[in-house]
Protein backbone atom coordinates (compact mmCIF):
# COMPACT_ATOMS: atom_id res chain seq x y z
CA UNK A 1 0.00 0.00 0.00
CA UNK A 2 1.20 3.51 -0.77
CA UNK A 3 1.90 5.89 2.11
CA UNK A 4 4.54 8.48 2.97
CA UNK A 5 7.64 7.14 4.69
CA UNK A 6 7.67 10.06 7.15
CA UNK A 7 5.85 13.33 7.74
CA UNK A 8 6.54 16.43 9.77
CA UNK A 9 3.10 16.17 11.44
CA UNK A 10 1.04 13.01 12.01
CA UNK A 11 -2.39 14.61 11.61
CA UNK A 12 -3.84 17.05 9.13
CA UNK A 13 -6.95 19.22 9.04
CA UNK A 14 -9.86 18.18 6.85
CA UNK A 15 -9.69 21.04 4.33
CA UNK A 16 -11.89 21.51 1.27
CA UNK A 17 -11.37 19.92 -2.13
CA UNK A 18 -12.20 22.74 -4.56
CA UNK A 19 -11.08 23.97 -7.96
CA UNK A 20 -9.59 22.16 -10.94
CA UNK A 21 -6.28 20.31 -11.16
CA UNK A 22 -3.54 22.59 -12.46
CA UNK A 23 -0.66 20.12 -12.44
CA UNK A 24 -0.59 16.57 -13.78
CA UNK A 25 -3.34 17.21 -16.32
CA UNK A 26 -1.57 15.84 -19.42
CA UNK A 27 -0.34 12.38 -20.36
CA UNK A 28 3.40 12.84 -19.81
CA UNK A 29 4.98 9.38 -19.54
CA UNK A 30 2.88 6.85 -21.47
CA UNK A 31 0.66 6.81 -24.54
CA UNK A 32 -2.73 6.50 -22.82
CA UNK A 33 -4.12 7.77 -19.54
CA UNK A 34 -7.05 7.59 -17.15
CA UNK A 35 -8.14 11.14 -16.27
CA UNK A 36 -10.47 12.15 -13.43
CA UNK A 37 -13.59 14.06 -14.46
CA UNK A 38 -15.01 14.16 -10.94
CA UNK A 39 -13.58 15.17 -7.60
CA UNK A 40 -13.05 13.19 -4.43
CA UNK A 41 -10.63 11.19 -2.36
CA UNK A 42 -8.86 8.03 -3.45
CA UNK A 43 -7.60 5.83 -0.64
CA UNK A 44 -4.37 3.88 -0.91
CA UNK A 45 -6.45 0.68 -1.12
CA UNK A 46 -8.49 2.00 -4.05
CA UNK A 47 -5.35 3.11 -5.91
CA UNK A 48 -3.84 -0.34 -5.38
CA UNK A 49 -7.04 -2.17 -6.43
CA UNK A 50 -7.19 -0.21 -9.69
CA UNK A 51 -3.48 -0.86 -10.32
CA UNK A 52 -4.02 -4.59 -9.87
CA UNK A 53 -7.01 -4.55 -12.23
CA UNK A 54 -4.88 -2.86 -14.91
CA UNK A 55 -1.96 -5.25 -14.41
CA UNK A 56 -4.18 -8.33 -14.57
CA UNK A 57 -5.70 -7.22 -17.85
CA UNK A 58 -2.54 -6.21 -19.70
CA UNK A 59 -0.59 -9.15 -18.22
CA UNK A 60 3.07 -8.47 -19.07
CA UNK A 61 2.30 -6.31 -22.06
CA UNK A 62 3.04 -2.72 -21.19
CA UNK A 63 4.29 -0.29 -18.58
CA UNK A 64 2.16 1.58 -16.03
CA UNK A 65 2.69 4.85 -14.20
CA UNK A 66 0.69 5.84 -11.12
CA UNK A 67 0.52 9.64 -11.21
CA UNK A 68 -1.10 10.12 -7.79
CA UNK A 69 0.11 9.46 -4.27
CA UNK A 70 -1.90 9.24 -1.04
CA UNK A 71 -0.18 11.83 1.14
CA UNK A 72 -3.07 13.02 3.35
CA UNK A 73 -3.71 11.15 6.62
CA UNK A 74 -7.34 10.59 7.62
CA UNK A 75 -7.93 10.14 11.33
CA UNK A 76 -10.81 8.28 12.94
CA UNK A 77 -11.96 7.73 16.48
CA UNK A 78 -12.71 4.13 17.49
CA UNK A 79 -16.31 2.87 17.48
CA UNK A 80 -18.50 3.74 20.49
CA UNK A 81 -16.12 6.34 21.88
CA UNK A 82 -17.56 9.48 23.47
CA UNK A 83 -17.04 12.87 21.88
CA UNK A 84 -14.06 14.93 22.99
CA UNK A 85 -10.74 13.63 24.29
CA UNK A 86 -8.83 14.87 21.27
CA UNK A 87 -8.57 13.91 17.65
CA UNK A 88 -8.48 10.25 16.61
CA UNK A 89 -5.47 8.41 15.29
CA UNK A 90 -4.54 8.35 11.57
CA UNK A 91 -6.29 5.31 10.08
CA UNK A 92 -5.59 5.50 6.34
CA UNK A 93 -4.12 7.69 3.62
CA UNK A 94 -5.88 9.43 0.74
CA UNK A 95 -5.03 11.40 -2.38
CA UNK A 96 -7.25 14.44 -2.97
CA UNK A 97 -8.34 14.41 -6.62
CA UNK A 98 -9.58 17.41 -8.62
CA UNK A 99 -11.18 17.18 -12.07
CA UNK A 100 -8.57 17.04 -14.84
CA UNK A 101 -5.93 15.05 -12.94
CA UNK A 102 -4.34 12.11 -14.79
CA UNK A 103 -4.44 9.13 -12.41
CA UNK A 104 -2.74 6.35 -14.37
CA UNK A 105 -0.72 6.15 -17.58
CA UNK A 106 0.17 3.21 -19.79
CA UNK A 107 2.32 2.46 -22.82
CA UNK A 108 3.34 -0.57 -24.86
CA UNK A 109 -0.19 -1.89 -25.45
CA UNK A 110 -2.85 -1.38 -28.11
CA UNK A 111 -5.52 1.27 -27.62
CA UNK A 112 -8.30 -1.34 -27.32
CA UNK A 113 -6.39 -3.19 -24.57
CA UNK A 114 -5.65 0.09 -22.76
CA UNK A 115 -9.30 1.18 -22.95
CA UNK A 116 -10.51 -2.11 -21.50
CA UNK A 117 -7.86 -2.11 -18.75
CA UNK A 118 -8.77 1.45 -17.74
CA UNK A 119 -12.49 0.57 -17.83
CA UNK A 120 -11.83 -2.24 -15.34
CA UNK A 121 -9.73 0.09 -13.18
CA UNK A 122 -12.38 2.84 -13.25
CA UNK A 123 -14.90 0.40 -11.79
CA UNK A 124 -12.70 0.23 -8.66
CA UNK A 125 -12.65 4.01 -8.19
CA UNK A 126 -15.32 6.20 -6.53
CA UNK A 127 -14.88 9.11 -8.96
CA UNK A 128 -15.85 9.48 -12.61
CA UNK A 129 -13.00 9.14 -15.11
CA UNK A 130 -12.35 9.24 -18.83
CA UNK A 131 -9.84 7.69 -21.24
CA UNK A 132 -7.29 10.05 -22.79
CA UNK A 133 -4.56 9.52 -25.38
CA UNK A 134 -1.30 11.43 -25.68
CA UNK A 135 -1.27 14.13 -28.33
CA UNK A 136 2.08 13.99 -30.12
CA UNK A 137 3.63 17.44 -30.33
CA UNK A 138 1.59 18.82 -27.45
Curated annotation (Swiss-Prot):
Listed GO CC annotations: cytosolic large ribosomal subunit
Segments of this protein annotated with the region Disordered: 1-22
CDD domains linked: Ribosomal_L16_L10e
Coiled coil: none
Chaperone among keywords: no
Basic residues bias: start-end ranges: 1-13
Highest taxon in the source lineage: Bacteria
Any Gene Ontology biological process: translation
Gene Ontology molecular function: rRNA binding; structural constituent of ribosome; tRNA binding
Protein's job: Binds 23S rRNA and is also seen to make contacts with the A and possibly P site tRNAs.
Known partners and oligomeric status: Part of the 50S ribosomal subunit.
PANTHER family per UniProt: 50S/60S RIBOSOMAL PROTEIN L16, LARGE RIBOSOMAL SUBUNIT PROTEIN UL16M
Similarity comment text for this entry: Belongs to the universal ribosomal protein uL16 family.
Name of protein: Large ribosomal subunit protein uL16
Organism: Bordetella petrii (strain ATCC BAA-461 / DSM 12804 / CCUG 43448)
Name of encoding gene: rplP
